[in-house]
Amino acid sequence: MKICIIGYSGFLGSYILKKLSKKFFIIKINLREMPEFDDKNFKNFLNKFNKSNIIINCAAALKPRSKRDFFINQDFPKTLSLHMKKMKKKFLFIHMSTINVLIKDRKDPYTISKRIAEKKLLNTNTTILRLPLLIKKKNGYIQKGGNLSILFNYLNLNFLPFYPMIFPGHTFKPVTLDNII
């Protein structure tokens, strides 16, 4: 079985890669190497996925600003799904999203782009996993990494007598990476 991991170098993707590479053949795809959508080599890039039985999309621009960032978050998953359908390829497509898409008050670019991606993936053969805050533990201790490092840095500010949480606030119900796989 061949499993393709998109975003294999990120916090979640690298963990999934480490766990699954012990049992399966892994195809690693880096979207930073992806040609522009209108580039003649874009189809060749998509063909890299053709031999995959399972595709796990962990790629995301957490602070999307550029046209490319938004393409990665909201358009690429649907583009890939349509490509694989066109190739008449049987595969399982797992798209990682965020639990924040369910919070209507969340208006940050990342959440909006993930919400759009989910809408575009409706009526496709895609499994969407909405993940909460992910944490990594080592020897029973929470490690600074992923989005948790933002919270650690925030709480490490020494000059504030209190720590305001900006509206709409965040609901932190962390899940350890070990519980994902």
Predicted stretch roles:
Residues 3-22:
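N-terminal Rossmann NAD(P)H-binding glycine-rich loop of SDR-like oxidoreductase domains
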Residues 37-79, 99-105:
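NAD(P)H-binding glycine-rich loop region in Rossmannoid oxidoreductase-like domains
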Residues 55, 180-181:
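Non-catalytic, hydrophobic alpha-helical segments
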Residues 69, 106-113, 173-177:
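The catalytic Tyr-centered alpha-helix of NAD(P)H-dependent dehydrogenases
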Residues 76-80, 116-117, 176-179:
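Conserved cofactor-binding/catalytic machinery of classical short-chain dehydrogenase/reductase
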Residues 78-113, 123-132:
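Conserved Rossmann-fold NAD(P)-dependent oxidoreductase catalytic core, especially the SDR/UDP-sugar
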Residues 102-108, 129-152, 170-171:
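Flexible, glycine-rich beta-alpha linker
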Residues 153-175:
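A conserved pocket-lining segment of Rossmann-fold NAD(P)-dependent short-chain dehydrogenase/reductase
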